[in-house]
């Protein structure tokens, strides 16, 4: 239909198709340059800081305590607070606790439970729900993705817990970046209302900016506690600029060799025992111990 309505100008049908494709490629490059100009040049994924890795594991544990199979933004918040011990009282979690008047992970979880009506952990199937059964919700993955983008924009060497909190509290810079992306997506939908609308349909949910509900209840909690969000944002940005959290300093090959050696040792110990004396949880416990000692767990991947 498009070819039938297009002017011939002495061109053959093949030449018309070539011109249309070239025009589409030019428009695509123009849009790509607009996105890069607004969001910056894409960089490789940044590593997670030791505190952030611990927070992701703690988020799964908090989901279990709330009888949830999916860890959302609120569980990320609880995970950051639960992992505050790694900051020696000087990290992002400690700053947030101080702003909340000493509110720790347990008190915040109780408040969240009151808002959602959650209760103690329930039985799932034939056994208790375990942290390894919990997955991150799409909203939590979106928060983590925005935190990584914020860390890249700041020139940070890793994704820290302060980046997570900045996103969860709806910091201005993060919202502006998301809004800019939404404007580009909206422009693309309008420009391609003829061909693109028929081929793709409506814009996918991943292109839409997150609603306040997608960021969890941290903003509501700060309002209830009477916290100055601007002052808190300044403190978190100062931690981010200072690089208060660093990626785990470890060699990947050495780490893998250490994990293999540990699990091999556990296997030999269990084989040496009589079958009725073997510990079925030995490998799981060894895996947890090595994960805490070496940094991010493979299950912590969110993409």
Swiss-Prot record:
Keywords: Chloroplast, Plastid, Transit peptide. The keyword RNA-binding does not apply. SUPFAM superfamilies: Double Clp-N motif. Residues 185-214, 278-303 are annotated as: Disordered. It is found in: Plastid, Chloroplast. Its main location: plastid. InterPro entries: Clp_N_dom_sf (IPR036628). It comes from the Eukaryota. One of its GO terms (cellular component) is chloroplast. Transmembrane segments: none annotated. Coiled coil: none annotated. Residues 1-37 form a transit peptide. Accessory protein regulating the assembly of the plastid Clp protease system. This is ATP-dependent Clp protease ATP-binding subunit CLPT3, chloroplastic. The gene is CLPT3.
């Amino acid at each position: 239909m498009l070819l039938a309505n297009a002017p011939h100008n002495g061109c053959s049908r093949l030449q018309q198709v070539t011109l249309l494709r070239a025009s589409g490629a030019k428009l695509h490059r123009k849009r790509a340059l607009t996105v890069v100009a607004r969001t910056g040049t894409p960089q490789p994924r940044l590593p997670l800081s030791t505190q952030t890795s611990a927070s992701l594991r703690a988020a799964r544990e908090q989901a279990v305590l709330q009888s949830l199979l999916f860890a959302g933004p609120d569980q990320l918040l609880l995970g950051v607070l639960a992992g505050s011990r790694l900051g020696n009282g000087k990290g992002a979690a400690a700053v947030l606790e101080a702003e909340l008047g000493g509110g720790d992970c347990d008190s915040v979880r109780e408040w969240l439970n009151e808002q959602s009506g959650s209760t103690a952990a329930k039985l799932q199937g034939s056994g208790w729900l375990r942290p390894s059964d919990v997955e991150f919700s799409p909203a939590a993955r979106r928060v983590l993705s925005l935190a990584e983008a914020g860390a890249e924009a700041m020139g940070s060497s890793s994704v820290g817990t302060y980046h997570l909190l900045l996103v969860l509290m709806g910091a201005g810079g993060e919202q502006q970046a998301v809004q800019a992306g939404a404007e580009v997506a909206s422009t693309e939908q309008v420009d391609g209302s003829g061909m693109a609308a028929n081929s793709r349909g409506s814009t996918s949910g991943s292109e839409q900016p997150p609603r306040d509900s997608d960021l969890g209840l941290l903003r509501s909690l700060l309002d209830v506690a009477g916290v100055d969000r601007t002052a808190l944002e300044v403190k978190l940005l100062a931690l981010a600029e200072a690089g208060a959290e660093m990626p785990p300093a470890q060699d990947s090959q050495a780490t893998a060799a250490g994990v293999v050696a540990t699990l091999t040792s556990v296997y030999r110990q269990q084989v040496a025992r009589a079958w009725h004396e073997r510990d079925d949880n030995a490998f799981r416990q060894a895996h947890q111990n090595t994960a805490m000692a070496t940094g991010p767990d493979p299950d912590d991947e969110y993409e």
